[in-house]
Regions:
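Single conserved hydrophobic/aromatic residue that forms the stacking wall/gate
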Residues: 1-5, 9
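Terminal amphipathic helices with adjacent charged low-complexity linkers/tails
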Residues: 10-38, 46-51, 55
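C-terminal amphipathic alpha-helical interaction region
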Residues: 30, 41-92, 96-205
Length: 205
């Protein structure tokens, strides 16, 4: 059994066990059963262990796939969506640049170690979207090779993003960036997948 398949089994068995069945997969009201475990030390410990294992799996996977070496103990801050201006990957990229200069020029060190994970494809004729992908990769080159900033930040653009990489990324994510322009997202569902895998969700409103 593959590591990924094993992790899926662990996550599902935890949710099934806590909610009393697998009915939550078709009836989300069953998730109310989880509320009583919000402060349960044993449950939180198990959840942290599952998340840590998934993060280690992703770190191994991304290194084998495209040579990116990341710290599994860092915060995995993820934005995986079709590349579009309204989805605001550019805003996220500019935030990384801001962090870079705060560390590099201002000497800020009170920064949690963070790995920014992007996954996206651009429509063939969408020049702006392709430019944003190029910018994110350029920021990654700058950040990842800086002897000072790379101690705190790392940027990964997952190549050839599709469903298969998502199966590796989503279980490992700590922070799920859902920052599309308010009112523009017709029917986003990836946020739910992240939530069911224990990710925190900053959102636009």
């Amino acid at each position: 059994e593959s590591s990924a398949a094993s992790d899926v089994y662990k996550r599902q068995s935890l949710l099934d066990r806590l909610s009393g069945s697998d009915e939550w997969t078709t009836d989300l009201s069953k998730l109310k059963e989880l509320r009583k475990y919000a402060d349960d030390p044993a449950v939180l410990k198990e959840l942290r262990e599952i998340k840590a294992a998934n993060k280690q799996d992703f770190a191994r996977w991304i290194e084998q796939r495209q040579g990116s070496v990341i710290d599994p103990d860092s915060v995995y801050d993820t934005q995986i969506k079709r590349l579009h201006e309204y989805k605001r990957q550019l805003m996220n990229a500019l935030y990384i640049i801001d962090l870079y200069f705060r560390i590099k020029e201002d000497g800020e060190t009170d920064v949690p170690k963070r790995t920014f994970i992007f996954g996206a494809k651009a429509a063939p004729g969408y020049t702006m979207a392709k430019g944003i992908i190029k910018l994110i990769n350029a920021i990654g080159e700058l950040v990842n090779n800086d002897p000072v900033v790379s101690k705190y930040l790392h940027v990964v653009f997952v190549e050839n993003y599709n469903v298969s990489p998502a199966e590796q990324i989503i279980p490992a994510t700590d922070v799920s960036e859902q920052i599309s322009t308010a009112g523009k997202e017709a029917s986003g569902t990836s946020n739910m997948k992240f939530m069911m895998n224990g990710a925190l969700t900053p959102v636009s409103y």
